[in-house]
Design a protein with these regions (language model features):
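A short, basic N-terminal segment
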Residues: 1-36, 41, 59, 111, ...
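C-terminal leucine-rich, beta-strand-based interaction scaffolds used for sensing/assembly
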Residues: 2-4, 293-372
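Short, Lys/Arg-enriched N-terminal segment that forms or immediately precedes the first helix
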Residues: 7-11, 285-300
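P-loop NTPase nucleotide-binding core
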Residues: 39-44, 48-153, 337
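Conserved Walker B catalytic segment
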Residues: 124-192, 201
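Helix-loop-helix "sensor" segment of P-loop NTPases
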Residues: 198-249, 271-273
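Conserved C-terminal helix/linker of AAA+ ATPases
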Residues: 244, 267-290
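C-terminal helical "lid" of AAA+/P-loop NTPase domains
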Residues: 245-250, 256-270, 308-314, 344
Length: 372
């Protein structure tokens, strides 16, 4: 039996929860020549929403869409690598004409192009070491976008990551290329709201006022409850509203983990059966135990002050004034300067996020594990 609670891969429109107004706004903006910034906490569905929009008929039929996630990148070389690979894999393979144009334009990495006689398809064997001059490669990539036979839509997920690159002029470099490119519009998305907000809202920054800003909140519980019950009913199963509420509130409306719990609850519920809160609680406990080794390994790489602060933030839930004497005393931390050094690294490692001077564990499941 098909499981309608999709965790990875393509989501059919009928299995996509809510977000109709958000999708309409994104599609309207981007197809009318505007750039847009989407800000949301991690795992509330921004990437799936972007994929859903790029897969809409109006975009699929009239635009070339290119999508990359740069969360794991740490330099301009890696950025050029990811974007170059995406241009070839997601755009150039659409037609022989596009392929020839990309091959002729990406001259700085021309030796990476080849052909597979078995599958009868072109290949692009690019490795990070092949990019010796990333600025020149980026210039060529944007030239490819400019010369494409259809207008391009480029989605860059976790865009705030460029702020961590050692190349301090990265924002100015990218802004220059984007401004010059008349044949592409951009979707910038990010989960570190404070960094994305500063990047697009501060007058001194290169991306100031260059895109429409959209905040993506969690799906309201009433809408998700209606969605989940409807899918269970469609397959002749049932689930208690209280069970859905338990999953929803445990993960603070985090779409990814709620879907994961619902996916397993659907698997465990027989036709004519009912998923209840007891089942949901057992699934959540199992999820935490399944990730014990992963979270333990993450902690093993942290210094003692970083671990102590991570546990303190997990215990607080939403931690404020973390360098204050009261917070330090309550959680037996070392000093204000020690906390400042530790939080800088925890933010850099994406273990903690911040919004409006409040700090919280980035991964809700890890937060639950830390409190066990």
């Amino acid at each position: 039996m098909e499981n309608p609670f999709i965790i990875t891969g393509y989501i059919k429109p009928e299995y996509f929860c809510d977000r109709k107004q958000e999708a309409k706004r994104i599609i309207t903006k981007i197809t009318n020549g505007e750039n847009i910034v989407i800000m949301a906490a991690r795992r509330v569905g921004k990437s799936k929403l972007i994929d859903f929009c790029l897969d809409s008929p109006i975009i699929k039929d009239n635009f070339i869409s290119i999508s990359i996630d740069i969360l794991r990148t740490s330099s301009i070389n890696e950025f050029a690598f990811e974007l170059g690979k995406a241009v070839f894999e997601q755009a150039a393979r659409r037609s022989t004409k596009l392929l020839k144009m990309v091959v002729n334009t990406l001259k700085s990495i021309n030796g990476c192009f080849g052909y597979d006689p078995i599958s009868n398809t072109p290949t692009f064997n690019l490795s990070l070491g092949d990019i010796s001059n990333p600025l020149y490669t980026l210039e060529e990539i944007f030239a490819c976008l400019e010369q494409a036979d259809k207008k391009c839509i480029v989605a860059i997920d976790e865009f705030q990551q460029i702020g961590y690159y050692p190349e301090k002029n990265m924002e100015a470099v990218l802004r220059t290329y984007i401004q010059r490119c008349s044949n592409a519009n951009f979707i910038f998305s990010g989960s570190e709201r404070h960094l994305i907000t500063e990047m697009f809202s501060e007058k001194a920054r290169p991306f100031y006022n260059s895109a429409d800003i959209m905040n993506l909140d969690v799906i309201p519980i009433d809408r998700y409850t209606e969605f989940a019950i409807g899918l269970f009913h469609h397959f002749d199963k049932d689930i208690q509203a209280e069970a859905i509420a338990l999953a929803y509130h445990t993960f603070g409306g985090n779409t990814y983990y709620i879907q994961k719990v619902m996916h397993e609850a659907f698997n465990q519920t027989d036709p004519k059966g009912v998923a209840d809160s007891e089942m949901i609680d057992a699934i959540i406990r199992s999820l935490i135990l399944d990730n014990d080794r992963k979270f333990s390994e993450i902690l093993s790489r942290l210094t003692l002050p970083q671990k102590e602060l991570l546990y303190a933030i997990a215990k607080a839930g939403m931690a404020k004034k973390i360098t204050s004497a009261a917070f330090i005393k309550k959680h037996n931390l070392r000093s204000g300067s020690s906390v400042q050094s530790a939080i800088k690294k925890l933010l850099e490692y994406h273990l903690v996020s911040t919004s409006q001077a409040t700090y919280y564990i980035d991964d809700q499941l890890m937060g639950l594990w830390l409190k066990m």
